[in-house]
Protein backbone atom coordinates (compact mmCIF):
# COMPACT_ATOMS: atom_id res chain seq x y z
CA UNK A 1 0.00 0.00 0.00
CA UNK A 2 2.99 2.29 0.41
CA UNK A 3 4.32 3.71 -2.83
CA UNK A 4 7.97 3.02 -1.97
CA UNK A 5 8.37 0.71 1.04
CA UNK A 6 12.18 0.80 0.87
CA UNK A 7 12.25 4.59 1.00
CA UNK A 8 9.83 4.61 3.94
CA UNK A 9 12.06 2.20 5.87
CA UNK A 10 15.05 4.45 5.24
CA UNK A 11 13.07 7.45 6.48
CA UNK A 12 12.20 5.50 9.62
CA UNK A 13 15.90 4.93 10.27
CA UNK A 14 16.66 8.61 9.80
CA UNK A 15 14.03 9.53 12.40
CA UNK A 16 14.98 6.86 14.93
CA UNK A 17 11.95 4.61 14.38
CA UNK A 18 13.31 1.22 15.42
CA UNK A 19 10.37 -1.13 14.82
CA UNK A 20 7.79 -1.47 12.03
CA UNK A 21 4.90 -3.93 11.83
CA UNK A 22 3.70 -4.32 8.26
CA UNK A 23 0.28 -5.69 7.37
CA UNK A 24 -0.44 -8.43 4.83
CA UNK A 25 -4.00 -9.17 3.72
CA UNK A 26 -3.83 -12.30 1.54
CA UNK A 27 -7.34 -11.70 0.19
CA UNK A 28 -6.29 -8.29 -1.09
CA UNK A 29 -2.55 -8.44 -1.81
CA UNK A 30 -1.68 -12.13 -1.72
CA UNK A 31 1.52 -12.99 0.13
CA UNK A 32 3.87 -10.93 -2.03
CA UNK A 33 5.22 -8.95 0.92
CA UNK A 34 6.92 -12.08 2.26
CA UNK A 35 8.97 -12.41 -0.91
CA UNK A 36 9.51 -8.67 -1.42
CA UNK A 37 10.67 -7.74 2.10
CA UNK A 38 14.35 -8.79 1.75
CA UNK A 39 14.65 -6.70 -1.41
CA UNK A 40 13.00 -3.71 0.27
CA UNK A 41 15.52 -3.90 3.10
CA UNK A 42 18.44 -4.00 0.65
CA UNK A 43 17.06 -1.01 -1.24
CA UNK A 44 16.42 0.79 2.06
CA UNK A 45 20.09 0.40 2.99
CA UNK A 46 21.10 2.10 -0.25
CA UNK A 47 18.51 4.86 0.26
CA UNK A 48 19.71 5.36 3.81
CA UNK A 49 23.35 5.75 2.75
CA UNK A 50 22.28 8.37 0.21
CA UNK A 51 20.25 10.25 2.83
CA UNK A 52 23.10 10.31 5.33
CA UNK A 53 25.54 11.42 2.64
CA UNK A 54 23.20 14.21 1.53
CA UNK A 55 22.73 15.35 5.12
CA UNK A 56 26.48 15.38 5.66
CA UNK A 57 27.09 17.30 2.47
CA UNK A 58 24.66 19.92 3.66
CA UNK A 59 26.69 20.36 6.82
CA UNK A 60 29.84 21.25 4.92
CA UNK A 61 33.18 19.60 4.33
CA UNK A 62 33.58 16.35 6.25
CA UNK A 63 29.97 16.39 7.43
CA UNK A 64 29.21 13.08 5.78
CA UNK A 65 31.74 11.42 8.11
CA UNK A 66 30.29 12.82 11.30
CA UNK A 67 27.15 10.71 11.45
CA UNK A 68 27.19 6.94 11.61
CA UNK A 69 24.68 5.10 9.48
CA UNK A 70 21.59 4.59 11.70
CA UNK A 71 20.12 1.08 11.82
CA UNK A 72 17.11 0.17 9.73
CA UNK A 73 14.03 -0.71 11.78
CA UNK A 74 13.24 -4.28 12.66
CA UNK A 75 10.30 -5.38 10.47
CA UNK A 76 7.73 -7.98 11.47
CA UNK A 77 4.54 -9.02 9.71
CA UNK A 78 0.91 -9.21 10.78
CA UNK A 79 -1.11 -11.34 8.37
CA UNK A 80 -4.88 -11.64 8.26
CA UNK A 81 -7.99 -10.99 6.21
CA UNK A 82 -9.48 -7.55 6.84
CA UNK A 83 -13.24 -7.40 7.49
CA UNK A 84 -13.68 -5.60 4.15
CA UNK A 85 -12.51 -8.82 2.48
CA UNK A 86 -14.20 -11.32 4.79
CA UNK A 87 -16.35 -12.54 1.90
CA UNK A 88 -13.17 -13.84 0.26
CA UNK A 89 -12.00 -15.93 3.23
CA UNK A 90 -12.41 -19.44 1.82
CA UNK A 91 -11.32 -22.66 3.50
CA UNK A 92 -8.36 -22.78 1.14
CA UNK A 93 -7.32 -19.25 2.11
CA UNK A 94 -7.60 -20.10 5.81
CA UNK A 95 -5.29 -23.06 5.22
CA UNK A 96 -2.83 -20.92 3.24
CA UNK A 97 -2.88 -18.25 5.93
CA UNK A 98 -2.21 -20.86 8.59
CA UNK A 99 0.87 -22.04 6.73
CA UNK A 100 2.15 -18.49 6.33
CA UNK A 101 1.79 -17.94 10.05
CA UNK A 102 4.63 -20.45 10.43
CA UNK A 103 7.01 -17.90 8.93
CA UNK A 104 9.00 -16.62 11.90
CA UNK A 105 8.76 -13.06 10.65
CA UNK A 106 5.02 -13.18 11.41
CA UNK A 107 4.23 -11.84 14.86
CA UNK A 108 0.45 -11.33 14.77
CA UNK A 109 -2.80 -12.16 12.99
CA UNK A 110 -4.36 -9.00 11.63
CA UNK A 111 -5.92 -6.74 10.77
CA UNK A 112 -8.99 -8.78 11.60
CA UNK A 113 -12.31 -7.71 13.08
CA UNK A 114 -15.53 -6.00 12.04
CA UNK A 115 -16.33 -2.91 9.99
CA UNK A 116 -19.98 -1.89 10.08
CA UNK A 117 -19.27 1.53 8.58
CA UNK A 118 -18.53 0.43 5.03
CA UNK A 119 -20.11 -3.07 5.20
CA UNK A 120 -18.03 -4.23 2.23
CA UNK A 121 -18.70 -7.79 3.36
CA UNK A 122 -22.05 -8.90 4.84
CA UNK A 123 -22.04 -8.61 8.62
CA UNK A 124 -22.70 -12.33 9.31
CA UNK A 125 -19.79 -13.16 7.00
CA UNK A 126 -17.56 -10.67 8.81
CA UNK A 127 -18.42 -12.24 12.14
CA UNK A 128 -17.64 -15.76 10.93
CA UNK A 129 -14.35 -14.66 9.37
CA UNK A 130 -13.44 -12.93 12.62
CA UNK A 131 -14.17 -16.06 14.64
CA UNK A 132 -12.18 -18.24 12.26
CA UNK A 133 -9.12 -16.02 12.50
CA UNK A 134 -9.30 -15.69 16.29
CA UNK A 135 -9.19 -19.49 16.42
CA UNK A 136 -6.29 -19.57 14.00
CA UNK A 137 -4.35 -17.02 16.06
CA UNK A 138 -4.91 -19.00 19.23
CA UNK A 139 -3.75 -22.21 17.54
CA UNK A 140 -0.62 -20.42 16.31
CA UNK A 141 0.05 -18.78 19.68
CA UNK A 142 0.01 -15.31 18.12
CA UNK A 143 -1.65 -12.04 19.19
CA UNK A 144 -4.41 -10.44 17.14
CA UNK A 145 -4.48 -6.93 15.69
CA UNK A 146 -8.05 -5.67 15.56
CA UNK A 147 -9.82 -3.39 13.11
CA UNK A 148 -13.10 -2.31 14.70
CA UNK A 149 -15.31 0.37 13.18
CA UNK A 150 -18.81 1.02 14.49
CA UNK A 151 -18.82 -2.60 15.64
CA UNK A 152 -17.12 -2.60 19.03
CA UNK A 153 -20.02 -4.22 20.88
CA UNK A 154 -20.21 -7.21 18.54
CA UNK A 155 -16.43 -7.46 18.35
CA UNK A 156 -16.02 -7.49 22.11
CA UNK A 157 -18.81 -10.06 22.49
CA UNK A 158 -17.20 -12.39 19.95
CA UNK A 159 -13.83 -12.16 21.67
CA UNK A 160 -15.47 -12.82 25.03
CA UNK A 161 -17.16 -15.93 23.58
CA UNK A 162 -14.10 -17.22 21.73
CA UNK A 163 -11.65 -16.18 24.42
CA UNK A 164 -9.14 -13.38 24.12
CA UNK A 165 -5.88 -14.88 22.80
CA UNK A 166 -3.35 -15.49 25.55
CA UNK A 167 -0.66 -14.00 23.29
CA UNK A 168 -2.44 -10.66 23.39
CA UNK A 169 -4.98 -8.41 21.68
CA UNK A 170 -4.17 -5.04 20.13
CA UNK A 171 -6.97 -2.60 19.37
CA UNK A 172 -5.61 -0.82 16.32
CA UNK A 173 -5.80 2.93 15.62
CA UNK A 174 -8.14 3.72 18.51
CA UNK A 175 -10.25 6.84 17.89
CA UNK A 176 -13.07 6.67 20.45
CA UNK A 177 -13.46 7.83 24.06
CA UNK A 178 -12.32 6.67 27.45
CA UNK A 179 -15.53 4.78 28.22
CA UNK A 180 -14.95 2.52 25.21
CA UNK A 181 -11.27 2.13 25.94
CA UNK A 182 -11.93 1.08 29.54
CA UNK A 183 -13.56 -2.26 28.84
CA UNK A 184 -10.82 -3.29 26.40
CA UNK A 185 -8.16 -2.36 28.93
CA UNK A 186 -10.00 -4.30 31.63
CA UNK A 187 -9.96 -7.32 29.30
CA UNK A 188 -6.17 -7.06 29.13
CA UNK A 189 -5.88 -5.53 25.66
CA UNK A 190 -3.24 -3.20 24.30
CA UNK A 191 -4.45 0.05 22.74
CA UNK A 192 -2.61 1.66 19.79
CA UNK A 193 -3.03 5.35 19.00
CA UNK A 194 -2.33 6.83 15.59
CA UNK A 195 -3.05 10.08 13.82
CA UNK A 196 -6.47 10.71 15.43
CA UNK A 197 -4.72 11.34 18.75
CA UNK A 198 -3.27 14.51 17.21
CA UNK A 199 -6.42 15.82 15.51
CA UNK A 200 -7.49 19.19 16.86
CA UNK A 201 -11.09 18.20 17.64
CA UNK A 202 -10.31 14.74 19.05
CA UNK A 203 -10.11 15.55 22.75
CA UNK A 204 -12.08 12.37 23.51
CA UNK A 205 -9.26 10.31 21.98
CA UNK A 206 -6.69 12.09 24.16
CA UNK A 207 -8.97 11.43 27.14
CA UNK A 208 -8.89 7.74 26.26
CA UNK A 209 -5.09 7.74 26.09
CA UNK A 210 -4.91 9.11 29.63
CA UNK A 211 -6.75 6.12 31.09
CA UNK A 212 -4.76 3.38 29.35
CA UNK A 213 -2.03 1.95 31.61
CA UNK A 214 1.35 2.95 30.26
CA UNK A 215 2.37 -0.69 29.85
CA UNK A 216 -0.59 -1.23 27.46
CA UNK A 217 0.04 1.76 25.17
CA UNK A 218 1.41 1.68 21.63
CA UNK A 219 1.78 4.25 18.86
CA UNK A 220 1.23 3.63 15.15
CA UNK A 221 0.48 5.40 11.89
CA UNK A 222 -1.97 3.22 9.90
CA UNK A 223 0.09 4.37 6.88
CA UNK A 224 -0.75 5.47 4.27
CA UNK A 225 -3.86 6.74 6.09
CA UNK A 226 -4.57 8.91 9.15
CA UNK A 227 -1.62 11.29 8.77
CA UNK A 228 -1.05 13.08 12.09
CA UNK A 229 -1.07 16.82 12.62
CA UNK A 230 0.67 19.01 11.52
CA UNK A 231 0.99 17.02 8.28
CA UNK A 232 -2.66 16.04 7.95
CA UNK A 233 -3.72 16.08 4.30
CA UNK A 234 -0.48 14.51 3.06
CA UNK A 235 0.29 10.85 2.49
CA UNK A 236 1.17 9.12 5.75
CA UNK A 237 4.33 7.06 6.19
CA UNK A 238 5.64 4.94 9.08
CA UNK A 239 8.13 7.63 10.11
CA UNK A 240 5.22 9.97 10.89
CA UNK A 241 4.76 8.04 14.12
CA UNK A 242 7.20 10.53 15.69
CA UNK A 243 4.45 13.19 15.57
CA UNK A 244 1.95 10.94 17.31
CA UNK A 245 4.49 9.94 19.93
CA UNK A 246 5.26 13.60 20.62
CA UNK A 247 1.57 14.37 21.22
CA UNK A 248 1.21 11.31 23.44
CA UNK A 249 4.07 12.61 25.58
CA UNK A 250 2.21 15.92 25.94
CA UNK A 251 -1.08 14.20 26.77
CA UNK A 252 0.53 12.10 29.48
CA UNK A 253 2.48 14.99 30.98
CA UNK A 254 5.93 13.77 29.98
CA UNK A 255 7.21 17.34 29.78
CA UNK A 256 10.92 16.94 30.49
CA UNK A 257 13.55 15.24 28.34
CA UNK A 258 13.96 12.55 30.98
CA UNK A 259 10.21 11.91 31.25
CA UNK A 260 9.85 11.76 27.47
CA UNK A 261 12.74 9.34 27.16
CA UNK A 262 11.22 7.10 29.85
CA UNK A 263 7.79 7.09 28.21
CA UNK A 264 9.14 6.46 24.71
CA UNK A 265 11.26 3.60 26.02
CA UNK A 266 8.15 2.10 27.61
CA UNK A 267 6.17 2.40 24.36
CA UNK A 268 8.96 0.64 22.48
CA UNK A 269 9.15 -2.09 25.13
CA UNK A 270 5.40 -2.61 24.81
CA UNK A 271 5.61 -3.00 21.04
CA UNK A 272 8.58 -5.31 21.33
CA UNK A 273 6.92 -7.50 23.95
CA UNK A 274 3.71 -7.85 21.96
CA UNK A 275 4.91 -7.86 18.35
CA UNK A 276 8.62 -8.67 18.25
CA UNK A 277 8.57 -11.86 20.26
CA UNK A 278 10.39 -15.16 19.84
CA UNK A 279 8.98 -17.83 17.50
CA UNK A 280 5.96 -19.70 18.83
CA UNK A 281 5.83 -23.51 19.12
CA UNK A 282 3.56 -23.43 16.02
CA UNK A 283 6.28 -21.65 14.09
CA UNK A 284 8.91 -24.14 15.21
CA UNK A 285 6.93 -27.09 13.86
CA UNK A 286 7.62 -28.30 10.30
CA UNK A 287 5.26 -27.01 7.63
CA UNK A 288 2.28 -29.18 6.77
CA UNK A 289 2.03 -27.76 3.23
Regions found by a protein language model. Give the residues of each.
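Mid-domain alpha/beta scaffold segments of enzyme catalytic cores
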Residues: 1-289
